[in-house]
A protein has these predicted regions:
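Phosphate/NTP-binding elements of NTP-utilizing enzymes
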Residues: 1-173
């Protein structure tokens, strides 16, 4: 029997799924049925890493569903999330046209996608059904963005899934 050989890209992706140390509050958060979860936790508390993994698992497991990740600016969301999400979603296995560097979108073969959005222009989130997502650094987002842009996107009715209610994590310190 020969040993399985992995490419350097595969190894990087697998290493990115390192084991996390579970904290009781993090486990409570993950188990909570709340639709909107406000997570005011200190720096280095693991909130962003937990969210990255939650959304990566959902986009891989839930077919035909668009997800979003947002931060106050496009530069911020790209810096905090883009490289990690490409690793967590094993994008090296996808055709090149499934990853859009200009749109900051990952499209998976199951029909689901993750789009990174800068909320310096919160209208970017409007007009599409969102299955779920999260906003990092929520305290720095424009005060009107939740009511005028984010909440309506989460409440967009999808006739193919009439009972589904989109979820959102709001992360901050």
């Amino acid at each position: 029997m020969t040993a399985q050989k992995f490419s350097p890209a595969q190894i990087r992706c697998m290493q990115r799924w390192y084991p996390l140390k579970d904290h009781p509050e993090q486990l409570r958060l993950l188990a909570s049925p709340a639709r909107f979860k406000v997570i005011p936790a200190g720096r280095r508390s693991g909130k962003t890493e937990r969210f990255k993994r939650k959304i990566a698992k959902d986009v891989l497991a839930v077919p035909d569903s668009p997800f979003f990740i947002a931060a106050p600016t496009r530069a911020q969301v790209k810096k905090i999330y883009w490289e990690d999400m490409k690793l967590l979603c094993f994008t090296h296995l996808l055709p090149r046209d499934c990853v859009s560097e200009s749109e900051l979108t990952i499209r998976l073969p199951n029909g689901s996608s993750i789009t990174l959005i800068g909320l310096d222009q919160p209208q970017r989130i409007e007009g599409t059904f969102c299955a779920g997502g999260g906003v990092d650094e929520i305290a720095d987002v424009k005060k009107t963005a939740w009511i005028e842009n984010i909440s309506p996107a989460l409440d967009t009715y999808n006739p193919l899934r009439p009972d589904y209610r989109a979820w959102c994590w709001l992360l901050g310190v």
